[in-house]
């Protein structure tokens, strides 16, 4: 008895490798519906394979440390919120567990919101340790954004429940005695930094969404404090509030 296209599609969707797909008995079924199902499954498997290869590439710096220090406890550190006109800069320090596998990890700005939230939940539940560090708008104005970012990163490290032995940091160096590697675009090159990027992004977005409940005119739940048209118009109409960065333009010129 010939299987229906629906039944064949179910079999095809259970295939886990391209090689298995090409050797499957259904591969020779010439019905258009079957061939379409095969094409869809191939595309999905190719995408998954690309994510796996990307993930392996992004473990390079972790593996280099582990070659020399097999028992190393590696902490990835990243921040979000250097550019907005309002709100804190938020850093996250993340120590992945030894059997980590979070396909789709990348620079948080490149990850779709739904996937970002999914990864964030998995990371919070499964990593060895994580902690956030915040530098306020007042501290940004007092020290400058670069120094405030360093402060936020160190606070995140200090908040960890597990002491790391090595640091992987996105494009920054810290006044810290631990061995550290600073990576330009580290959130796209290291799984540890990418994990910290995701977690910091979700934390700060949530913070700004909560802030928008007290200050709805600025649209923080949509712009996260960046200088969008709505945000700038609100500044013109009602002025600034305590979490605006007074050292940033155009706010600085308004004071």
Swiss-Prot record:
Q: Where is the RNase H type-2 domain?
A: 72-255
- Parts forming coiled coils: none
Per UniProt, the keywords (alphabetical) are: Cytoplasm, Endonuclease, Hydrolase, Manganese, Metal-binding, Nuclease
Gene Ontology CC annotation, any one: ribonuclease H2 complex
Q: Which cofactor does it need?
A: Mn(2+); Mg(2+)
Membrane-spanning intervals of the chain: none
Q: Which cell locations does it reside in?
A: Cytoplasm
The record lists the catalysed reaction(s) as: Endonucleolytic cleavage to 5'-phosphomonoester
Which InterPro entries does the entry link to? RNase_HII, RNase_HII/HIII, RNase_HII/HIII_dom, RNaseH-like_sf, RNaseH_sf
Which Pfam families does the record cross-reference, listed alphabetically?
A: RNase_HII
PANTHER family from the UniProt entry: RIBONUCLEASE H2 SUBUNIT A, RIBONUCLEASE HII
Which HAMAP family does the annotation name? RNase_HII_B (MF_00052_B)
NCBIfam families reported for this sequence: PRK00015.1-1, PRK00015.1-3
Name the UniProt record assigns to this protein: Ribonuclease HII
From what organism does this protein derive?
A: Staphylococcus aureus (strain NCTC 8325 / PS 47)
